[in-house]
Amino acid sequence: FVNQHLCGSHLVEALYLVCGERGFFYTPKAGIVEQCCAGVCSLYQLENYCN
């Protein structure tokens, strides 16, 4: 997994992959869209959004 742009459904799919059964907490206020779609994010950064 390399740092990459993740937007829309790709971002959601990546969160499901990373978080698995834990699920994830998604809110635009958290900045995940700015971080991962406008910029790039890593696997480690995605894990911050897991429950």
Swiss-Prot record:
<dbReference type="GO" id="GO:0050714">
    <property type="term" value="P:positive regulation of protein secretion"/>
</dbReference>
<dbReference type="GO" id="GO:0006006">
    <property type="term" value="P:glucose metabolic process"/>
</dbReference>
<dbReference type="GO" id="GO:0042593">
    <property type="term" value="P:glucose homeostasis"/>
</dbReference>
<dbReference type="InterPro" id="IPR004825">
    <property type="entry name" value="Insulin"/>
</dbReference>
<keyword id="KW-0372">Hormone</keyword>
<dbReference type="GO" id="GO:0005615">
    <property type="term" value="C:extracellular space"/>
</dbReference>
<protein>
    <recommendedName>
        <fullName>Insulin</fullName>
    </recommendedName>
</protein>
<keyword id="KW-0964">Secreted</keyword>
<comment type="similarity">
    <text>Belongs to the insulin family.</text>
</comment>
<keyword id="KW-0119">Carbohydrate metabolism</keyword>
<comment type="subunit">
    <text>Heterodimer of a B chain and an A chain linked by two disulfide bonds.</text>
</comment>
<dbReference type="GO" id="GO:1901701">
    <property type="term" value="P:cellular response to oxygen-containing compound"/>
</dbReference>
<feature type="disulfide bond" description="Interchain (between B and A chains)">
    <location>
        <begin position="7"/>
        <end position="37"/>
    </location>
</feature>
<feature type="disulfide bond">
    <location>
        <begin position="36"/>
        <end position="41"/>
    </location>
</feature>
<dbReference type="InterPro" id="IPR022352">
    <property type="entry name" value="Insulin_family"/>
</dbReference>
<dbReference type="InterPro" id="IPR016179">
    <property type="entry name" value="Insulin-like"/>
</dbReference>
<comment type="function">
    <text>Insulin decreases blood glucose concentration. It increases cell permeability to monosaccharides, amino acids and fatty acids. It accelerates glycolysis, the pentose phosphate cycle, and glycogen synthesis in liver.</text>
</comment>
<dbReference type="GO" id="GO:0005179">
    <property type="term" value="F:hormone activity"/>
</dbReference>
<dbReference type="InterPro" id="IPR036438">
    <property type="entry name" value="Insulin-like_sf"/>
</dbReference>
<keyword id="KW-1015">Disulfide bond</keyword>
<keyword id="KW-0313">Glucose metabolism</keyword>
<dbReference type="InterPro" id="IPR022353">
    <property type="entry name" value="Insulin_CS"/>
</dbReference>
<feature type="disulfide bond" description="Interchain (between B and A chains)">
    <location>
        <begin position="19"/>
        <end position="50"/>
    </location>
</feature>
<dbReference type="Pfam" id="PF00049">
    <property type="entry name" value="Insulin"/>
</dbReference>
